[in-house]
């Protein structure tokens, strides 16, 4: 969906969007829905791995199918969640229904319909929407931090190289006002140490 940059919520998704493309997948609504799917699927697999919950036992093929839903999550999948949300009026419930719909198709070819239905009822079992949202937002922050950290590390290296390269070059008016000539001080390298 293209929007006019003048209608963007902030300059980050407007005029600077081409500089933040890596962050769009993470912090967009698509990114939130994708991470909700990841959290729900991880929880389902954890329940299936618990020996005391025999009703939720999944085959290796079913676990792979759950992993595949997460790995192949697409814009079309996110749109399907949004379509379901129009009926449910609940964003996290829409993710739950999407997963039941998606996994039912895969599971039914491998197991009996009643066994499939029992497993699918464990999606979101024992969770609140807040549980799913808290984890999803934490994953968004973690993934965003990885992207930003990489950019900051690159910038830090450039500043450190420039501080060394220009250490003996005199500067004129470093404060924007006439002053006696000076040289870059060790403080020019401090931002590098702070960012590291």
Q: What are the roles of these predicted feature ranges?
A:
Residues 1-196:
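A helix-coil-helix interface module used to build multimeric assemblies
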């Amino acid at each position: 969906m293209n929007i006019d940059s003048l209608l963007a919520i902030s300059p980050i998704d407007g005029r600077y969007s081409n500089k933040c493309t890596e962050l769009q997948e993470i912090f967009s609504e698509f990114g939130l829905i994708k991470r909700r799917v990841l959290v729900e699927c991880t929880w389902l697999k954890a329940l299936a791995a618990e020996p005391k919950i025999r009703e939720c036992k999944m085959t290796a093929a079913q676990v792979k199918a759950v992993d595949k839903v997460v790995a192949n999550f697409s814009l079309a999948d996110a749109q399907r969640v949004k379509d379901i949300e129009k009926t449910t009026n609940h964003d996290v419930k829409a993710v739950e229904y999407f997963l039941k719909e998606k996994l039912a198709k895969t599971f039914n070819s491998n197991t009996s319909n009643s066994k499939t239905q029992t497993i699918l009822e464990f999606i979101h079992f024992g969770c609140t929407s807040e549980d799913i949202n808290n984890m999803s937002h934490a994953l968004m922050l973690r993934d965003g931090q990885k992207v930003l950290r990489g950019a900051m590390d690159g910038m830090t290296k450039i500043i450190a190289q420039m501080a060394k390269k220009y250490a003996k070059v005199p500067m004129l008016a470093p404060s924007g006002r006439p002053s006696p000539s000076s040289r870059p001080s060790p403080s020019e390298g401090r931002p590098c140490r702070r960012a590291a």
